[in-house]
Amino acid sequence: MSEMEVMASIMRDHIIELLREGKRIDGRSFEDYRDLEIKVNVIEKAEGSAWVRLGDTQVLVGIKAELGEPFPDLPDRGVITTNVELVPLASPTFEPGPPDENAIELARVVDRGIRESQAVDLEKLVIVPGKLVRVIFIDVHVLDHGGNLLDASGIGAIAALLSTKLPKVNYNEETGEVEILDEYEPLPVNHVPIPVTFAKIGNSIVVDPSLDEERVMDGRLTITTDETGHISAAQKGEAGAFKMEEVMYALEVALKKGNEIREKVLKAVGRA
């Protein structure tokens, strides 16, 4: 066994022993989040943006909007696409190059939470049905990895969307010309989905795992809900299994914590 494996085993034993005593390595209770800070409109040239700090984790989310064609099977809907960049300076485990499986999973979970909750009214992004729609790009940049990138990124994405303003557009049906006006309107956001992530370590389940907890967790579960209680995304990670009663417990906590975080997001964007 290598020195690194020995240290990981010692850390796991220490964390599990603390959990048996009802404690976490950073002093939080099992259902406590780390300190959460949200700032919006932090990228001047983006249509919307947000910076999120969750404990030692930092993410920056920018929103860009372009005009383009709709998907052939959804001619009366605008388009949303989510991309994630794991900045190499954020973690020794991040490498430059194309997105790896972690970045792809992160982008998919964030995208699914927004898309399946119908957070953005895609019908209102249509300029000409079947021909011209707004294409919204959600770009997530992980600046510092201190654990629980899923929640930090999802919170940053919805905060950035809520801060987004789009230039009004005039379309001339006779000439087919498009005029971009110097007038702006808010992106139509109808729901505020919030992801809540749990780590299973031994027989204990904790919310918002730190990086130390992620390194020793047996399983991970992320549940995204909106203000109506609708579940828009769920993602399981790692090999460990969750019992049905553990999933139901996680759902109950996800709804409660989602409401608490949602209030902070709305306050940050001036909609509280």
Curated annotation (Swiss-Prot):
InterPro entries: ExoRNase_PH_dom1, ExoRNase_PH_dom2, ExoRNase_PH_dom2_sf, Exosome_comp_Rrp42_subfam, PNPase/RNase_PH_dom_sf, Ribosomal_Su5_D2-typ_SF, Rrp42_archaea. GO terms for cellular component: cytoplasmic exosome (RNase complex). SUPFAM superfamilies: Ribonuclease PH domain 2-like (SSF55666), Ribosomal protein S5 domain 2-like (SSF54211). GO terms for molecular function: mRNA 3'-UTR AU-rich region binding. The keyword Cytoplasm applies. It is found in: Cytoplasm. Pfam families: RNase_PH (PF01138), RNase_PH_C (PF03725). Its main location: cytoplasm. GO terms for biological process: rRNA catabolic process. Belongs to the RNase PH family. Rrp42 subfamily. Non-catalytic component of the exosome, which is a complex involved in RNA degradation. Contributes to the structuring of the Rrp41 active site. NCBIfam families: PRK04282.1-1. HAMAP family: Exosome_Rrp42 (MF_00622). Component of the archaeal exosome complex. Forms a hexameric ring-like arrangement composed of 3 Rrp41-Rrp42 heterodimers. The hexameric ring associates with a trimer of Rrp4 and/or Csl4 subunits. This is Exosome complex component Rrp42. It comes from Thermococcus kodakarensis (strain ATCC BAA-918 / JCM 12380 / KOD1).
